[in-house]
Regions:
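Blade-level signature of beta-propeller repeat domains, shared across WD40, Kelch, NHL, RCC1
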Residues: 401-447
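Beta-rich, blade/repeat-based domains predominating
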Residues: 80-93, 137-156, 198-221, 252-292, ...
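Conserved beta-strand positions in repeat-built beta-propeller and related beta-rich domains
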Residues: 99-105, 158-162, 221-227, 288, ...
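Beta-propeller blade signature
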Residues: 110-119, 174-188, 234-240, 425-444
Length: 447
């Protein structure tokens, strides 16, 4: 099969069949030409043994066409279009969708909304709570809500970083502003838990929350801190006491010099034209099988630890760190996590336009792994975790937060990697509207 290179073209000659491409001039398809009939093409392969690959025949190679990045998994259904980029999502028992519009880079009119139609929203639980007034106690209003979640007894919780949009990067939160608040589904405030002031040091940045209503006397809340030093917090919902664990350890901190990838482009963090590396720590969080799962956003790592261990005040920080389980890398940044009632954890793989999953219970194994067989009992050891792809679709533009209800997995998207802080010279390459979706998984929320 002769190969010739001339005048910047590469020509691969198969008999009288030739495919030409000029490097750097665009899509390969636009530079392909076919000189003879398919019969001539076939004649060039007259000596190919039966059963081997032939051009454009059955079993032809992957990557034959530019559009060969296929769709994996079930179809996704749009449920709401947003004019701003949301980070948080919840769904109540009536299938109402709630979204949060954070104030990380600027003010937003409403921090938390309920969707009233495919395109419309209104402030939730009220317009008055959305913005703190001059001199108001920041524990009584929204400063910078990051997420909203539904717990197992029908309460909606918001997690507020307490860091105003005008604060310098790395600033500590306002005391009283960093908090979680519980509401019933009519929007009535039930209780506010303020994060103690001594735990706000080093820029503690509350990002996401999950609630276990059955742990302890009145339940516990688990919160990821996505600051550079990072940590995982736990709040006793009985008395409000709070612990901050794993502070500034490798299991919550970003990879040094981390560079992500999105749609084929490398992603740095930019200050105008000054290049930096993203340092976002523990971000997404889920509770499943008695464990707390979290991912480190500026990495491809995720971890888990027993909920009981994390809240045990008798254990030292060193003992808690030693109990952390490392299942290995998962091939993507992970912006959000959620879990279902079968012990499956869903990982929102932002770099891959995908949602992954991993089973944590042996009873849910789909195939033998090492010495484990499907239908077993107990937890799957970390070394035997196999992360799989649930869905991959070009419409999944950085899935961020998700929730499961009545068999549906809901999630929002926000194109984070295309936002000004991750684009050269603070260019905003996002294109709205920002759509939230759902897909069928046939399972209920984690309890």
């Amino acid at each position: 099969m002769p190969i010739r290179i001339d005048q910047g073209y590469k020509a691969f000659k198969l008999g009288d069949y030739c495919v030409n491409s000029r490097p750097g001039t665009g899509s390969l398809v636009s530079h392909m030409w076919y000189s003879l009939s398919s019969a001539s093409i076939a004649s060039a392969y007259w000596d190919t043994p039966t059963g081997e690959y032939r051009p454009f025949g059955p079993g032809y190679n992957r990557g034959a066409y530019p559009q060969d990045y296929g769709v994996t998994g079930p179809p996704i259904q749009g449920v709401h279009d947003s004019q701003q980029a949301p980070t948080g999502l919840a769904v109540d028992h009536e299938h109402n969708v709630y979204l949060t519009y954070p104030r990380n880079t600027g003010q937003t009119p409403s921090n938390v909304v309920i969707c009233t139609s495919f395109n419309d929203e209104k402030p939730w639980p009220s317009a008055e709570i959305q913005n703190c007034t001059q001199g108001q106690d920041p524990s009584q209003c929204f400063v910078n809500v990051q997420n909203v979640v539904l717990d197992s007894i029908g309460q909606l919780w918001v997690v507020d970083s307490g860091i105003p949009y005008y604060a310098a990067s790395g600033s500590d939160a306002l005391y009283g502003g960093a908090k979680i608040m519980s509401f019933n589904q009519t929007g009535e405030l039930i209780r506010t838990y303020v994060i103690p002031q001594d735990l706000l040091a080093h820029g503690m940045n509350a990002n996401d929350v999950r609630i276990n209503n059955t742990l302890g006397t009145n339940g516990w809340a688990f919160i990821t801190d996505e600051s550079t030093n990072s940590s995982v917090l736990a709040i006793n919902l009985d008395d409000g006491s709070t612990v901050r664990r794993l502070f500034n350890t490798s299991v919550v901190r970003a990879d040094p010099g981390y560079v992500g990838s999105y749609e084929g482009e490398l992603i740095y963090c930019w200050n105008k034209t000054e290049k930096a590396y993203c340092t976002t720590g523990a971000d997404g969080i889920a509770l499943a099988s008695g464990q707390v799962f979290w991912g480190v956003l500026a990495s491809r790592r995720f971890y888990y630890i027993s909920q009981d261990v994390l809240i045990d005040s008798s254990l030292t920080d060193e003992q808690v760190l030693a109990a952390v389980q490392d299942p290995g890398q998962c091939g993507s940044e992970q912006a959000g996590f959620t879990a279902d009632d079968h012990g499956r954890v869903y990982i929102f793989a932002s770099e891959q336009n995908a949602i992954y999953y991993v089973d944590t219970l042996q009873s849910e194994l789909e195939m033998p792994v090492d010495d484990l067989k499907p239908g077993g009992t107990g937890l799957i050891p970390a070394k035997d975790y196999v992360v799989k792809t649930l869905v991959r679709n070009a419409m999944i533009q950085h899935a961020d937060s998700g929730a499961i209800l009545d068999g549906w997995l809901y999630f929002c998207t926000n194109q984070l990697e295309l936002s000004p802080g991750r684009q050269y010279n603070h260019t905003d390459n996002r294109r709205g509207p920002f759509r939230s979706y759902r897909l069928w998984v046939g399972r209920g929320p984690a309890v």
